[in-house]
Regions:
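Boundary-flanking segments of nucleic-acid-binding domains in nuclear regulatory proteins
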Residues: 1-267
Length: 267
């Protein structure tokens, strides 16, 4: 058997090959392969990357063949920083980098290390998310940003680097669903609107939380009219239950909204 390789058997009796290496008294699994030669190649690459401290991460990622992308990042970080992390993380001073690809590297505060060392980031349709207990959560939710938040509309990257997710670089513009911040005559105002079959404007408000309450009320009316759609709910943390109820009761939605809802019942 070639160095770093041992055999294993699947439930159906198929033989496959596992590669592993020991470094700094830690036994590291390198993956499973259909061919012994590939498993040995993974071992050879891992040995080279771990032994030669002058091999930079970018070079290792560009020249690996059998070793997986994630495992390469893990090994180089272990070599340089002495910490074994299963996800593709490389530690820097006071922050860390999460490698999605060789060209897409995200920066996070060190406070998030524990979370992302046990949660893999995935990208789909331009959105970054993690899976937790069978559910998918946008990484933006950790900043209090609503799902599918849009850069420039709902939040800003302060240094204009869209890969820098350190807390100091995230500025929330619009924390509420159904609310858009606008500037009219040099003054900041907030438009509430609901999406059912296209957008319907619910009015302009001087405070974002009032627009958020208007949106909540519009959602409640829509559901009360039998419109079967899941609407996100806004929570205004600084209002007591009675304060929220008073504002909710006093807030009047546009008269046309009731007619708009009725139009869906006659289709």
């Amino acid at each position: 058997m070639l160095p770093g390789v041992y055999t294993a058997v699947k439930k159906d009796g198929t033989v496959y090959y596992r590669a592993s290496i020991t470094c700094k008294n830690k036994h590291i699994s390198l993956g499973s392969y259909a061919l012994e030669s590939l498993a040995n190649q993974a071992y050879t690459e891992a040995e080279h990357f771990l032994r030669d401290a002058f091999v930079p991460l970018e070079y290792a990622l560009a020249h690996r063949s059998a070793l997986s992308f994630d495992k390469t990042v893990t090994l180089i970080n272990f070599r340089d920083n002495g910490v074994y992390i299963k996800t593709p993380i490389y530690l820097r001073k006071n922050y860390f980098e999460y490698y999605l690809t060789s060209t897409l590297v995200l920066k996070f505060d060190i406070d998030d290390l524990f979370y992302y060392s046990s949660h893999r980031i995935q990208k789909r349709g331009g959105h970054l998310f993690v899976s937790d207990y069978g559910m998918q959560y946008s990484i933006l939710s950790r900043y209090g940003i609503k799902n599918h938040g849009v850069p420039g509309k709902d939040f800003l990257f302060v240094n204009e680097d869209p890969t820098d997710y350190r807390y100091s670089n995230i500025k929330i513009i619009n924390p509420y669903a159904g609310v858009t911040r606008l500037t009219e005559n040099g003054k900041t105002v907030y438009q509430a609107k609901i999406h059912i079959n296209g957008y319907f404007s619910l009015g302009i408000y001087e405070q974002d939380y009032l627009a958020a309450i208007a949106y909540n009320k519009a959602c409640d009316l829509a559901k009360g009219m039998g419109i079967a759609k899941e609407f996100p709910v806004n929570y205004i943390d600084f209002l007591s239950a009675s304060e929220y109820a008073d504002l909710y009761s006093d807030l009047i939605l546009p008269e046309k909204y009731a007619a708009y809802l009725s139009s869906f019942l006659h289709r």
